[in-house]
């Protein structure tokens, strides 16, 4: 065993970064750290997307940081003198969570985020050992930096060298280097960042500025001969030995390390294109230390999780809105419609990258428009198109309601056909009676209103709630409207007359946040401020009372419910919470009456069980969810300004 004390320094940090597609390479490198007894406190792992962060932080229990370009730019350590007048290239949306290949624009975009992280850590006073993740470590490189090089060259001070950098085939390699924190190196990285663009990556920039700002310290004599100006301004760099720090060409092709029977410090699996090729080459040379099940989400679930149920990882992240997501809908042809407090509606189209399903592809914005200029959009309804050949956007008409207290009716080019007014408060939801021209809205003004698309003069107002009306649902067969409110009640209304038929107290923490109607079983489902779900039979409205619910679901979430969706094909209730949780519950028939948490005063015939736990909106309220049968996906939108998709 080699000594560790001399080369482990508190202000040295190993820094690495990965996206979800390279999680296996990163795990392979971390396995090397484990073999070398490199303590977790010595390295910082940055995750470039939510999926990678969730994988490492939650499923693997590995401490990591979610990379945020905005956070780094706005941090006190990185903001000064960082960007030129035109700013650096914003790489958001250019790279994805998938494995990128050399030469692709996504690959260069990822490369150009790397120096931002390095600069941020340098400015915090740490020396940085940057390592790409397509590298394996056979020995701790710090032994070479602090012991071997110093002894061979009689360097007396650890900081005699500013930069130790790996050699590539023709110049330096930006995939592995150790750089000390000082004014010279900070300026070097800053200048490199300011030179980046979509065609120039970090390696090209670093090579360029090292030629003008650096001196190659090949021996102590060169170090001693430096002028005072050079000592002050020039980066003193050292090229790492090609045999001890081989790149892909030198190790796998020329085999210069193996020819001398040397154990290298690292092996860089570059100079080969494609993630699959890198992995195959590692396997061929016995340098792959993990199993495929270690990167499989389902095999990494914590068995101590609630009821040992499956934890679902989201498939796609849709980022384009600049504020809270308020509603999600989809058309029959698979277009996705999202709205936000940012006053815009966005239409998304799924594009396959390979294969024929949503396992391979991304969502791209097909159209975006700001449509309620005086308030955020809160609810939408899509009238799907019957003739897709004449409509690029997958809908015939669109209804939107807003914080500006209006409802807008749009054509398929997002031009306003009609504006409906009447509410004096924020409109929380709108629903449409199927195969009719009538629609209903509920508002913070404590009322529900009925409108007619074909008759602007038709209006009916449902008055009775003593607080804002948060949600409504329709039973078309019984001509009944249901509503819930922060006054703690659920009301049943006759659609034809506007008369209130019944009032029940939900006893769900005061504010009843959401109700949905189950057509198949003639049941009403309510979600409360206390995190419970109740199911009510609508068979006998006149004899309804507060305790006559069929089933009470204790979600085990100390958080209020924001949205509910019911999938009649699978009998699953999807439930979104204020604390960022998302769960599904399975409803099953039970004629023996030993359901969980049922009201024993009723002849209960249903039972429930936790089906899945969906994790993705970390510490951010989920505002809305949507089941898309055309895409076979569940979507969620949150206060984090993101939409995420999940397999149904």
UniProtKB/Swiss-Prot annotation:
Thermal dependence: Optimum temperature is 37 degrees Celsius.
Activity: how regulated: Stimulated by dithiothreitol (DTT) in vitro. Totally inhibited by EDTA.
Broad class of enzyme this protein falls into: transferase
SMART domains xref list: WD40
WD repeat windows: 320-358, 372-420, 422-461, 464-505, 507-546, 556-595, 617-648
Chain segments annotated as coiled-coil in the UniProt record: none
Note: Not required for growth.
Domains: entry comment: Consists of two domains: an N-terminal catalytic domain and a C-terminal domain, not required for activity, that is predicted to form a beta-propeller-like protein-protein interaction domain.
Reported function: Specifically catalyzes the transfer of a galactosyl residue to the hydroxyproline-linked saccharide on Skp1 protein (fpaA/fpaB). Catalyzes the formation of a Gal-alpha-1,3-Fuc linkage, leading to Gal-Fuc-Gal-GlcNAc-HyPro143-Skp1.
Protein name: UDP-galactose:fucoside alpha-3-galactosyltransferase
Organism ancestry: Eukaryota, Amoebozoa, Evosea, Eumycetozoa, Dictyostelia
